[in-house]
């Protein structure tokens, strides 16, 4: 009798477990407006809405044309579903944007160019590419020196946030004097002024975004627009952060020195 009672209890518990799990599974189905298909995975993935237009430094860019729309769609999906990387960049922005924004403003550079720094280095101040670009703005050594940074065996100012930003501003000003268009300036930062100038002349394009370029540069301009969209309204793209989640500014002090530092740990 005792044995039967235990079996009865186990059977009843199993039945209850199944009864409880069915509504949970049904509740996790993904139903679109057109189809009633049950998902085989316990979550839904939906594409972010592509806006009809984007604004970069006051310039309205029409995204309704199919090729622009699809290129923007690609980058929005990339940032939306690169969950950990995008989340980390949003957190880092709280640390670095307050430093960068006044420097851009003081140099007459559009505030939107802070997003270029995001796609260059993921807001990692010690980022270094396989090609040798370094810092938040990913300057190559030759370009860094051209725009006033000291780069040698002892000093590398590409890692100095304020000085590297000032150098980036000098580049932006020079490029804008040539193109008169900030989006062309951003494309040249990736591909080089020589290439963008030659392609603008060769392709007779009215806008840099319409140039047929290498994939990296072609994506670069739309990545710039997409990251602005995501950072401007992270909640809309599923990134829900509290103030305490954001990375704070790092306190520091300046120490003057007149000799080389061979051993930093002993300095």
Q: Where do the protein language model's features map onto the residues?
A:
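Short, functionally critical alpha-helical segments immediately adjacent to catalytic or ligand/cofactor-binding
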Residues: 109-126, 185-190
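An acidic, Gly/Ser/Thr/Pro-rich helix-cap/linker signature
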Residues: 1-107
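Catalytic and substrate-binding regions of cell-wall glycan-acting enzymes that process beta-1,4-linked
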Residues: 37-79, 128, 135-138, 152, ...
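Extracytoplasmic
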Residues: 58, 95, 111-114, 118, ...
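Low-complexity, Gly/Ser/Thr/Pro-rich intrinsically disordered linker/tail segments
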Residues: 236-267
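Substrate-binding/active-site groove segments that recognize
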Residues: 131-153, 165-168, 172
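Solvent-exposed, polar/charged alpha-helical surfaces in well-ordered, non-transmembrane soluble domains
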Residues: 91, 95-98, 102, 114, ...
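Second-shell loop/turn segments in exported
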Residues: 79-90, 102-103, 123-130, 150-161, ...
């Amino acid at each position: 009798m005792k044995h039967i009672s235990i079996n009865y209890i186990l059977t009843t518990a199993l039945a209850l477990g199944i009864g409880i799990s069915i509504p949970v599974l049904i509740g996790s189905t993904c139903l679109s407006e057109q189809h009633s298909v049950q998902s085989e995975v316990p979550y839904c993935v939906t594409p972010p809405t592509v806006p009809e237009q984007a604004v970069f430094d006051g310039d309205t860019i029409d995204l309704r044309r199919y090729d622009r729309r699809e290129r923007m769609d690609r980058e929005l999906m990339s940032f939306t579903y690169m969950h950990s990387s995008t989340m980390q960049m949003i957190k880092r922005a709280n640390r670095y944007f307050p430093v960068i924004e006044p420097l851009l403003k003081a140099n007459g550079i559009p505030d939107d160019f802070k997003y270029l720094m995001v796609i260059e280095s993921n807001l990692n101040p010690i980022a270094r590419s396989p090609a040798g670009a370094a810092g938040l703005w990913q300057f190559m050594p030759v370009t860094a020196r051209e725009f006033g940074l000291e780069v040698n065996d002892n000093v590398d100012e590409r890692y100095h946030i304020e000085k590297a930003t000032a150098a980036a501003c000098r580049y932006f000003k020079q490029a804008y004097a040539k193109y008169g268009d900030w989006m062309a300036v951003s494309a040249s930062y990736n591909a080089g002024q020589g290439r963008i100038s030659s392609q603008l002349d060769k392709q007779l394009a009215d806008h840099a975004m319409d140039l047929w370029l290498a994939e990296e540069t072609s994506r670069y301009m739309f990545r710039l627009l997409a990251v602005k969209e995501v950072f401007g309204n992270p909640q809309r793209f599923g990134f829900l952060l509290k103030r305490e989640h954001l990375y704070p500014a790092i306190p520091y002090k300046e120490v003057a020195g007149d000799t080389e530092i061979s051993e930093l740990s002993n300095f």
